[in-house]
Design a protein with these regions (language model features):
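Hydrophobic alpha-helical bundle signature of multipass membrane enzymes
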Residues: 20-192, 213-219, 223, 229, ...
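Acidic/histidine-rich, metal-coordinating catalytic segments
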Residues: 203, 227
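Catalytic phosphate/nucleotide-handling subdomain of diverse soluble enzymes
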Residues: 208-210
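Bacterial N-terminal signal peptides
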Residues: 5-15
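Short, low-complexity, Pro/Ser/Thr/Gly-rich segments in the mature regions of secreted, periplasmic
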Residues: 239-253
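Short acidic/histidine-rich active-site segments
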Residues: 195-202
Length: 253
């Protein structure tokens, strides 16, 4: 419970409302996943049978009080909350105040990648597990908002995987911890009843596709270099390139 309490205390410093960050591409410019990922499994398939088994498994996992608290926290659709969550495996606080360049790369990078979910969600309009079974989610406060939104792919899973991809680019030494947390972040959506396992499984390559596309943005590449320079200065006390000395001066104020 200490871990959850730590996260919740950090969240008090986060903004209450989800941000709408500037993005490097529009949703129309993002790769259309309908053209490059499989459709959700048919209801008579072995894959869907596995989805049902995983949904039943997820309901048993809700009995774990610490995991349930983490799931409640992970469900909050807010980039500041996501930054709080991933600050732990990243190893530094990710915030506009303490790490402005990392924060900007993180929120705008993840905010761009997650746009890739919009078209396939509307196209497939897959029914969510809690809707299909007419049962409650663990995170009951989400139910009305999610009821008419497509289940495939999982927006939360895309966000979590995108967070790990962007932050591992800044701090490669934290790769294992970042992707372990991202994996659990997606799995938590199965446990709460928001998504089928196949939604979550498709969302990880979906995020990777968005991340590859993100690399083609010169503005993102420049912001990533600034974020790396800030990270190196904060961790090692050096500036990798003199053109980024202004970052150090701003941090020293």
């Amino acid at each position: 419970m200490k871990y959850i309490s730590f996260l919740l205390s950090l969240c008090l410093c986060a903004s209450v409302f989800a941000q709408n960050p500037q993005t490097y591409f529009t949703k129309e410019e993002m790769t259309n996943l309908v053209n490059c990922l499989p459709a959700p499994p048919d209801s008579g398939s072995l894959e869907f049978a596995n989805d049902i088994l995983r949904y039943m498994w997820g309901k048993t996992m809700r009995q774990d009080a610490e995991r349930a608290a983490e799931i409640e926290h992970d469900a909050i659709w807010n980039l500041d909350t996501l930054a709080v969550i991933f600050s732990v495996p990243f190893g530094l606080e990710i915030s506009q105040e303490k790490t402005p360049e990392i924060y900007k790369a993180f929120t705008q990078g993840v905010g761009t990648i997650e746009l890739i979910r919009i078209i396939p969600k509307a196209y497939y309009n897959r029914k969510r597990p809690y809707v299909m079974y007419n049962e409650h989610m663990l995170t009951t406060w989400e139910e009305d908002e999610l009821r008419n939104e497509g289940s495939y792919p999982s927006g939360h899973t895309i966000r979590g995987w995108a967070a790990a991809l962007v932050l591992a680019e800044i701090n490669p030494a934290a790769t294992t911890e970042l992707f372990a947390r991202a994996g659990r972040y997606g799995e938590n959506r199965v446990i709460t009843g928001a998504h089928w396992q196949s939604d979550v499984d498709a969302s990880r390559p979906a995020a990777s596709i968005g991340y590859v596309q993100l690399q083609s943005s010169p503005a993102y590449r420049e912001q990533m270099e600034r974020a790396r320079a800030e990270f190196v200065y904060l961790v090692y006390g050096t500036v990798p390139d003199k053109k980024y000395k202004a970052i150090v001066k701003n941090l020293a104020r």
